[in-house]
Design a protein with these regions (language model features):
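N-terminal nucleic-acid-engaging modules of covalent nucleotidyltransferase systems
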Residues: 27, 31-417, 498-509, 537-542, ...
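Short glycine/proline-enriched turns and hinge-like loops at secondary-structure junctions
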Residues: 288-290, 447-451, 467, 483-489, ...
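C-terminal structured "cap/appendage" subdomains that terminate the fold
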Residues: 528-582
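Flexible, glycine/threonine-enriched loop-and-boundary segments that flank and lead into catalytic domains
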Residues: 256-275, 421-424, 442-481
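Detector for conserved single-position "signature" residues within domains
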Residues: 429-433
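Short alpha-helix boundary/capping segments
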Residues: 1-5
Length: 614
C-alpha cells in the first residue's frame, strides 16, 4: 500500500515536471520577439573589417542561432547580397541615380551635395550611415525582406518614381546603420567577403559547435543549391532532415568537375580501362524538364553557375518538348555551329546568345546543337548513384527512338590502352576540338566535386600551357600612352583559394584585348569598384592596382608557362614562393562561370608541376 502511494507521488512529480517544462517553453516562445533587422546590420558591421574566416564563421553562427528558421533563411540570402537563390535571381532594376533621389528625399538635402559626399566616401551606404536621423520604428528582418521583394516586383509606367518613394520610406523606418547595408544590397555591393561555403561552416558551428557537419551540409547543398533552404531545414529539423534532402526538378544541382593530367599515359595509369568523350568548347547546361502537367510543361536551362538561362534557348525548348518523358535532369554542352559547313563555332560566338532582347533573332544568327553527356534524374528516379557507364546507356536509350536534330548524345569511346587514348585525342584535336574528357566507368555522379573520376586532356599549343585558366578580375591600372584615354592599361587577375575563401593574385595582364575590349572591360569594372581592397583578395603591396574591383568578373587567360613568383599570392606560403603566369593574354569572358568556379590555387600548382612531365 505504502509502495503504491510512493509510486503515485513519483508519477505526479514527474508529470508536474513535464508540464512545467512545456509551460516554460511556451512562455519563452511567447516572450520571443521577431529578429530586428538592426541585429543583422550590427552583425554585418562586425564582419565587415574582419578578414579571418574563423571569426566570420563564429559571428554568423551566433546570428543564425538567434534567428527563427524563416528568419535564418532570409539572413542567409541577404548576407550574400541576394533575395533569392541564383537560379531564381535578384533584380531590383534601380540605378544608383534613383537611389540618390531617395536619399535626397529622405534627408532633404541638395542632390549635388549628396553626390559630392558619395564621391568622397566612395559608397552611398557610408553616406547614409553618416547622416544620423531618428526613427521610432524597429523593422524586423521579415519586414525589410518583404519591402525589398516589393521593390523588386514594381514595374511598368511610373515604376521608378514608386521605387524612389518606397526606398525613401524604408530608409526613414530604419536606423542609419541598417540603411547602409540595405542600400548596398540593392546596388549589389554588400562586400562582406565570404561565400556560401562560409555560411555552411557557420551552420555546422551553430548546430554542432564545430565543423563536423560541414560535409553533410555541403553534400545537401550540392544536390539542392539553395543556401536559404539548407539553413531553414537545419533550423526547423535536424541533421537527419539535411541528410534526407534530395534532387528536385527545378532546383539546379551543382555540377561535377574534371581534374587535369598532362598526358594520355598519365591518365591511363590513373584510371585503367576508361571511356573518353570529345571536349566541346560550348556552354555547359543543366536541363530540368517537368511534364507532369501536360498542359503547362516546364523546361529550364541552368548555366554552370546556376543562373536560369532559359530565355537564351527557345529552339532547344521546342526540341526538348518532343521528348517522351515525365521529368528529367540532364547535362550537355550547347555549341554554336555554321549551318553551311556544320563546323563548330568558338565559345565567344556561342555566348552571343546571351542577350535580353532579340533572342529569336540571335537564335537564327547563331544556331546551335546540344550534346548530352550525363543524366541525373529520370521519371522520378535519381541517377546520381548509378555508375557512369549505366548513366550513359540510359541517356542513349532516352534518345534512341527520336530523331531530334538539335539534341544528340555526345560521342564516347571505350579506351583499353594509353596509345588508343593518345590516338583518339589527336583525332579530336585534328577535328578542331579542345581535346577529351576521360571518365572512370564505375564513377558515380558527385555533385560539386572536382576529382579524378573525370579528367581533362586538352591540346597543347607550342610554347603555351596546355590549357587556359579561368581567372577573376581583381583591379586595374590607369592607362599610359595610347591607352591613357581608355583610363585602363592593364588589369590584375587572381585564382580562387577554396580553403581560405580568398582570391589570390596570379598575373597582371596588358595584352590580348582590342581597343573596344579595353573600353568594355573598364565599363564592367567601374560598376564594381571599391575604394579599399576587398578583404577576400590577397595581394602584395607592390601589385596594388589603381582601382580595386569586387571579384565578380571571370575571364579566360592564356599564358606561355607558370613560373614561381616572390610577389604573387597564388599558392604562396611562409616556406614557398607563389605562382605567376608568364606572358598572360586575355582570351575572353566566362559569364557562364561563377567566381567560385574559377581556377584554384591547387590547380595552378598542378599545372606548374605538369610542365616538367615529359
Amino acid at each position: 500500500m505504502i509502495k503504491n502511494r510512493v509510486n503515485f507521488f513519483i508519477f505526479i512529480i514527474i508529470l508536474l515536471s513535464v508540464v512545467l517544462f512545456f509551460l516554460r517553453i511556451h512562455f519563452l516562445l511567447l516572450l520571443r520577439t521577431e529578429m530586428k533587422f538592426k541585429e543583422v546590420a550590427s552583425c554585418f558591421e562586425e564582419i565587415e573589417p574582419v578578414s579571418g574566416r574563423l571569426e566570420i564563421t563564429r559571428l554568423l553562427a551566433a546570428l543564425f542561432a538567434k534567428a527563427s528558421p524563416q528568419e535564418a533563411e532570409i539572413v542567409a540570402s541577404l548576407s550574400l547580397g541576394q533575395l533569392h537563390p541564383p537560379y531564381i535571381g535578384t533584380q531590383f532594376n534601380i540605378a544608383e541615380k534613383n537611389l540618390i533621389k531617395a536619399v535626397v528625399q529622405l534627408l532633404d538635402i541638395d542632390e549635388a551635395a549628396i553626390k559630392s559626399e558619395i564621391k568622397m566616401a566612395g559608397d552611398i551606404g557610408l553616406v547614409l550611415q553618416s547622416h544620423g536621423w531618428r526613427t521610432d520604428k524597429e523593422l524586423s528582418v521579415a519586414d525589410v525582406y518583404k519591402t525589398l521583394c516589393r521593390l523588386e516586383e514594381i514595374s511598368g509606367t511610373g515604376s521608378q518614381e514608386e521605387k524612389i518613394q518606397l526606398l525613401s520610406d524604408l530608409f526613414l523606418s530604419l536606423d542609419p546603420l541598417s540603411a547602409k547595408f540595405v542600400a548596398r544590397i540593392i546596388l549589389g555591393k554588400l562586400r562582406l567577403g565570404f561565400s556560401d561555403m562560409t555560411i555552411i561552416d557557420s551552420l555546422s558551428w551553430m548546430h554542432a559547435g564545430d565543423k563536423s557537419l560541414r560535409n553533410i551540409l555541403e553534400d545537401a547543398y550540392n544536390v539542392c543549391a539553395d543556401i536559404g533552404l539548407i539553413t531553414q531545414t537545419l533550423k526547423e529539423g535536424s541533421v537527419d532532415a539535411i541528410k534526407k534532402m534530395h534532387v528536385t526538378v527545378g532546383i539546379p544541382i551543382i555540377p561535377a568537375a574534371a581534374e587535369r593530367l598532362p598526358t594520355a599515359q598519365a591518365i591511363f595509369e590513373k584510371l585503367g580501362v576508361c571511356f573518353a568523350e570529345p571536349k566541346l568548347d560550348g556552354f555547359r547546361l543543366q536541363i530540368h524538364i517537368d511534364k507532369t502537367n501536360k498542359k503547362e510543361p516546364t523546361i529550364r536551362f541552368f548555366s554552370r553557375n546556376l543562373q536560369d538561362m532559359s530565355s537564351m534557348f527557345p529552339d532547344l525548348y521546342q526540341a526538348f518538348l518532343k521528348l517522351d518523358i515525365s521529368n528529367l535532369i540532364c547535362e550537355g554542352e550547347a555549341i554554336g555551329y555554321d549551318p553551311d559547313t556544320n563546323e563548330f563555332l568558338p565559345f565567344q560566338e556561342t555566348i552571343k546568345r546571351k542577350r535580353k532582347h532579340g533572342v529569336e533573332q540571335a537564335a537564327a544568327e547563331y544556331p546551335l546543337k546540344i550534346f548530352l553527356f550525363d543524366i541525373l534524374y529520370l521519371n522520378g528516379q535519381e541517377c546520381l548513384n548509378m555508375p557512369y557507364i549505366e548513366r550513359h546507356e540510359e541517356l542513349q536509350r532516352l534518345l534512341s527512338d527520336t530523331s531530334i536534330e538539335l539534341i544528340q548524345v555526345n560521342e564516347f569511346k571505350k579506351i583499353t590502352d594509353a596509345k588508343q587514348l593518345q590516338d583518339y585525342f589527336f583525332a579530336a584535336v585534328a577535328a578542331g576540338l579542345e581535346g577529351l574528357v576521360v571518365k572512370r566507368p564505375d564513377a558515380l555522379y558527385q555533385p560539386g566535386k572536382r576529382n579524378f573520376n573525370w579528367i581533362k586532356l586538352k591540346r597543347q599549343e607550342e610554347g603555351h600551357l596546355e590549357d587556359t585558366l579561368d581567372c577573376v578580375v581583381l583591379g586595374y591600372y590607369a592607362g599610359e600612352g595610347k591607352r591613357a584615354h581608355f583610363g585602363i592599361g592593364a588589369f590584375l587577375v587572381g585564382v580562387f583559394n577554396k580553403k581560405a575563401d580568398m582570391f589570390q593574385t596570379v598575373a597582371k595582364i596588358g595584352t590580348g584585348l582590342t581597343d573596344t575590349e579595353w573600353k568594355e572591360l573598364k565599363k564592367k569594372c567601374d560598376t564594381l569598384t571599391t575604394h579599399t581592397k576587398p578583404k577576400n583578395i590577397e595581394c602584395a603591396k607592390e601589385l596594388t592596382p589603381d582601382v580595386w574591383v569586387t571579384p565578380q568578373i571571370v575571364c579566360s587567360v592564356r599564358a606561355d608557362e607558370i613560373t614561381q613568383s616572390p610577389l604573387h599570392a597564388a599558392g604562396k606560403t611562409a616556406e614557398k614562393l607563389g605562382y605567376a603566369l608568364r606572358f598572360p593574354r586575355f582570351m575572353g569572358y566566362r559569364p557562364d562561370k561563377s567566381v567560385e568556379e574559377a581556377t584554384t590555387d591547387e590547380e595552378v600548382k598542378r599545372l606548374y608541376e605538369d610542365q616538367f612531365v615529359k
